[in-house]
């Protein structure tokens, strides 16, 4: 049973985003930062941690600085007085005298009004170094009012996470040519929504290195962490940045093949952060994949950064150069429906309801969810899950059904009216209280489509032509009007291949815990496709049709999949999956 103390800590972490940094990881960050100050032994370097918690990062950088004979002035800020008291006690015990702790909310120390980027200089002077693990709190936990205030105060765009406000505030508090080392979520590296953060970092920093810690679990956190190291640009004197930004990426590998190809073994996870060669490494009974290389930052900030080794980047570029197009050129990729009240609209026990509440057959449609996903095809035998679908095409437009025409559905929905009508966003959008929030075009469900789950450790793209609705934890692909259904079989062959998994990992680097990939519209849209009319593509289409339409033994499936892999390599004129 969770103790009261631990329960309070967990609750506080969720509300504030506070996750304390392990001492060894803190020392790794400190060492990387101070390497840029090796020659600075005749002056005092001012260091700030704007969310210092119990002082771990300040203690770590002080310890490393002592070993390098560098003098520091330490400044810590935190709104939690208990954390400040602990930090004060720990720093005092360390013997370091030149430190100052401030019990305030760092973000509240920013001046109001147009000069949002200016701090009260008397209270907190600009610093040479910022070392930080700022809180990560997403919009839905922050609340709309708080998020809007941060958006206005720090000139933030799109969905607001608390660490973004910290990035802006920290940047303004850092001297020109100062160094920052900050732990954040790794989402901004590869997601469309991270575009504004990428733009901000490129505009304000010479990027030195990014460490993507992936699912390695160096510390307890709700998100996958990354560490950003940058030198603040001097706006008055723009020097040429000769450094090629470096990256370090570590993810756990769970497959058996990986564990048999280990380069060397280590005693602790933290030792892996000092590895200087890409490869597979083991710690106890776990295997980790480490990649070192350079950061490719496209001119368009909306495009994700690519963290690739030289060989990976060369392979990736060759695939793109030899591609005929991308999935978005041939098909539409859509997310599934969003009911925002699944337990009301989606059930497997409709027949067990009172007869007067069992919705009319016309409104109950089979629905496919992520837990049913499989490669190539799925069987709907025994699947009783159906969705009460509240929309139809009327007068050529998508309209909510008229409940008066469906008395049993009306009875059922009215029995849940209190919950459904409490969805204020539905009513605010001038929609009916009983509607599914995102229904999509009802006329498209009967068309052939590819369905795939939003997260999965391996690709699970499968064919569906029985009129099923797609649940919100899945995506679906339908061909554009000018393309035949053949394109679906080519797309499916490409998407389910090891070839495309390799491409996905290089281009999007978005693995979650336990090696699960995220398959979002913005990623799948950018999957390369070979010439659909080539002999290799036509053979891929034929083999995928065979897998979809004929039940086969595992050995036969594996043989066909291997043939598809070879055909894909030929279609893209690539020699192998290896670099």
From Swiss-Prot:
Annotated InterPro entries: DNA_methylase_N6_adenine_CS (IPR002052), MethylTrfase_TaqI-like_dom (IPR011639), N4_N6_ade-DNA_methylase (IPR050953), SAM-dependent_MTases_sf (IPR029063), TaqI_C (IPR025931)
Matches recorded under Pfam families: Eco57I, TaqI_C
Signal sequence region: none
Keywords: DNA-binding, Methyltransferase, Restriction system, S-adenosyl-L-methionine, Transferase
GO MF: DNA binding; site-specific DNA-methyltransferase (adenine-specific) activity
Reactions this protein catalyses: a 2'-deoxyadenosine in DNA + S-adenosyl-L-methionine = an N(6)-methyl-2'-deoxyadenosine in DNA + S-adenosyl-L-homocysteine + H(+)
Alphabetized CDD domains for the sequence: AdoMet_MTases (cd02440)
Enzyme class: transferase
EC number(s) on file: 2.1.1.72
KW Transmembrane (keyword) present: no
Superkingdom of origin: Bacteria
An individual GO BP term: methylation
Family: Belongs to the N(4)/N(6)-methyltransferase family.
Annotated protein name in UniProt: Type II methyltransferase M.BseCI
